[in-house]
C-alpha cells in the first residue's frame, strides 16, 4: 500500500471546476482537506455575482465574473457542497460554463460551475465579503472586481 491506496489502483478522476467564491483560493480549499496543484485565474461571461447572504451567480448578458479554475475529485466536490447545504441550507448544482483564462496562455475550457437556484435574500457576512475580496486580489484578478465584491458590505 502507498498513501493508503492499493498499488496499481487508479487515481480518482479529477474534473475542472470554476470557483467564484472563496474556494478560488488554494488556502481555503486546504482548510477542507483539498489540495490543488494549480489555480488558473479565469473569467466567465454572461453571469454576474451577488452575495445575499452567500455568494452566487445570476445570468446577465454582457456581464463577467472572475474566479479560479482547479482540478478536483467528485468526492472533494461532494465534501464542499454537502457542507454548504448542511451549514447554510443551500443546494448548489453543477452547470457547464466556458472559462477564459485571464492570461491568454491557454485556451478557454468547458468547466463545471456550481450555482444555487434559490437563496433567501439576506445581509452578507462582512467577514466573508472581506475574505472574498482578499481571494480576488491574491489571484491578481481585476481590482475593479475586488471593489465590486467589497460593495456588498
What are these regions (language model features)?
Residues 2-153:
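Glycine-aromatic micro-motifs
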Amino acid at each position: 500500500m502507498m498513501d493508503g491506496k492499493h498499488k496499481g489502483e487508479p487515481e480518482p478522476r479529477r474534473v475542472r471546476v470554476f470557483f467564484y467564491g472563496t474556494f478560488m483560493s488554494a488556502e481555503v480549499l486546504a482548510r477542507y482537506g483539498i489540495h490543488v496543484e494549480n489555480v488558473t485565474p479565469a473569467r466567465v461571461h454572461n453571469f454576474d455575482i451577488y452575495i445575499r447572504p452567500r455568494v452566487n451567480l445570476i445570468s446577465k448578458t454582457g456581464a463577467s465574473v472572475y474566479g479560479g479554475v482547479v482540478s478536483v475529485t467528485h468526492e472533494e466536490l461532494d465534501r464542499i457542497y454537502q457542507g454548504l447545504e448542511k451549514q447554510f441550507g443551500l443546494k448548489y448544482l453543477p452547470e457547464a460554463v466556458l472559462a477564459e483564462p485571464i492570461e491568454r496562455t491557454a485556451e478557454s475550457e468547458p468547466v463545471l460551475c456550481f450555482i444555487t437556484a434559490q437563496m433567501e435574500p439576506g445581509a452578507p457576512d462582512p467577514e466573508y465579503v472581506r475574505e472574498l475580496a482578499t481571494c480576488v486580489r491574491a489571484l491578481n484578478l481585476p481590482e475593479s472586481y475586488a471593489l465590486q465584491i467589497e460593495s456588498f458590505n
